[in-house]
């Protein structure tokens, strides 16, 4: 069973048992999350828009992504600024699509 689910304003096409990285969730590692905003459900042959479908997932861990370096400069003024940013992600495992 596959489903197109919206998690934190981003859409993911998920299957049972799949692990994926989503934007940081407000839960602790080991907690069970339920996503009720399912946009599409498919069983391989047919797809349906089921409003009663839910996706259950287990939060495995919180991690940070790769570092992105931001560099700003103004010419002839000796102005240079370097900043770094690491986006936070949560790793989840899809338990069921029902």
Swiss-Prot record:
GO MF entry, a single one: structural constituent of ribosome
GO cellular component annotations of the record: cytoplasm; ribonucleoprotein complex; ribosome
InterPro entries: bL21-like, bL21-like_sf, Ribosomal_bL21, Ribosomal_bL21_CS
An annotated GO BP: translation
Alphabetized UniProt keyword annotations: Ribonucleoprotein, Ribosomal protein, RNA-binding, rRNA-binding
Similarity-based family: Belongs to the bacterial ribosomal protein bL21 family.
Description of how the protein assembles with itself and partners: Part of the 50S ribosomal subunit. Contacts protein L20.
Function field: This protein binds to 23S rRNA in the presence of protein L20.
Name of the protein in its database record: Large ribosomal subunit protein bL21
Gene: rplU
């Amino acid at each position: 069973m596959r489903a197109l689910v919206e998690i934190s304003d981003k859409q993911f096409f998920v299957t049972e048992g799949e692990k994926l990285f989503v934007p940081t969730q407000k839960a602790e590692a080991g907690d069970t999350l339920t996503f009720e905003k399912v946009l599409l459900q498919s069983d391989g042959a047919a797809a349906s828009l089921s409003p009663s479908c839910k996706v259950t997932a287990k939060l495995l861990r919180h991690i940070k992504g790769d570092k992105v370096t931001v560099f700003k400069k103004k010419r002839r003024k000796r102005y240079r600024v370097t900043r770094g940013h690491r986006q936070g992600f949560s790793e989840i495992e899809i338990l069921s699509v029902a």
